[in-house]
Amino acid sequence: MLAKRIIPCLDVDNGRVVKGVQFLDIRDAGDPVEVARRYNEQGADEITFLDITATHHGRDTTYRTVERMAETVFVPLTVGGGVRKVEDIRALLNAGADKVSINSAAVFNPEFVQEASQHFGAQCIVVAIDAKKTGDNKWEIFTHGGRKPTGIDAIEWAVKMADYGAGELLITSMDADGTKAGYDIALMRAINDRVTIPTIASGGVGNLQHLADGILQGGADAVLAASIFHFGQYTIPEAKQYLAEQGIEMRL
């Protein structure tokens, strides 16, 4: 059995972390490189960097930030946000990203995922799925940060993306996100019952048991969280220890 992974997530706008970070020993909590360095030292298995900068001009800042991060951090780095074409992926990989996350662009052009996977290999292509519950065991894909409904069934979409060459799925419940009430376990379970590629649970973590639930009940291969780590509520080692005590294989 492969060890499960803990992935802190940074939301970055114009080269600055936007969901506040409270580490006592960080000089500049707004600098994503400082924050990533801290998580690297704590033993994060991977780090995810979501660029929410809308502007074209902001992309250059992003590439520079990724370059600086890759020099500082020695765990796999996934970068997402605004990835629309093969050139974007190439630029991020060249800057030092290990994996690239594709979200809205996959919805508008599913063949892009096939093309990306063939070009660079499935191992570095993550498809991010933002899903909202619309009924009993039914979820719909939303784009534009969860604002735009697409009418696409999230479970069928996950299967399609796996078929199209995604190496991994990052599954965020728009309902759970920010609630601190735990992942949408039913959503994770429904997708994991249908796909064989690794999945990452995202959205809703408020405590360490939620991380365990994502793995033990949801079937996730990795668990992503932001605020519980950013605000110093828990450290990565505490989270790993807790999961290991639940019988989950971790890299301690």
Curated annotation (Swiss-Prot):
HAMAP family tied to this protein: HisF
CDD domains: HisF (cd04731)
Tree of life domain: Bacteria
Substrates-to-products reaction catalysed: 5-[(5-phospho-1-deoxy-D-ribulos-1-ylimino)methylamino]-1-(5-phospho-beta-D-ribosyl)imidazole-4-carboxamide + L-glutamine = D-erythro-1-(imidazol-4-yl)glycerol 3-phosphate + 5-amino-1-(5-phospho-beta-D-ribosyl)imidazole-4-carboxamide + L-glutamate + H(+)
Function: IGPS catalyzes the conversion of PRFAR and glutamine to IGP, AICAR and glutamate. The HisF subunit catalyzes the cyclization activity that produces IGP and AICAR from PRFAR using the ammonia provided by the HisH subunit.
UniProt-listed Pfam families: His_biosynth
Record GO terms (molecular function): imidazoleglycerol-phosphate synthase activity; lyase activity
Residue numbers annotated as active site: D11, D130
GO cellular component labels: cytoplasm
Pathway(s): Amino-acid biosynthesis; L-histidine biosynthesis; L-histidine from 5-phospho-alpha-D-ribose 1-diphosphate: step 5/9
Annotated family: Belongs to the HisA/HisF family.
Membrane among keywords: no
Organism of derivation: Acinetobacter baumannii (strain ATCC 17978 / DSM 105126 / CIP 53.77 / LMG 1025 / NCDC KC755 / 5377)
Protein known as: Imidazole glycerol phosphate synthase subunit HisF
Compartments reported by the entry: Cytoplasm
Subunit structure: Heterodimer of HisH and HisF.
Gene3D superfamilies: Aldolase class I (3.20.20.70)
GO biological process, one term: L-histidine biosynthetic process
Keywords (A to Z) from UniProt: Amino-acid biosynthesis, Cytoplasm, Histidine biosynthesis, Lyase
TM annotation in the entry: none
EC numbers on record: 4.3.2.10
InterPro entries: Aldolase_TIM, His_biosynth, HisF, IGPS_HisA/HisF, RibuloseP-bd_barrel
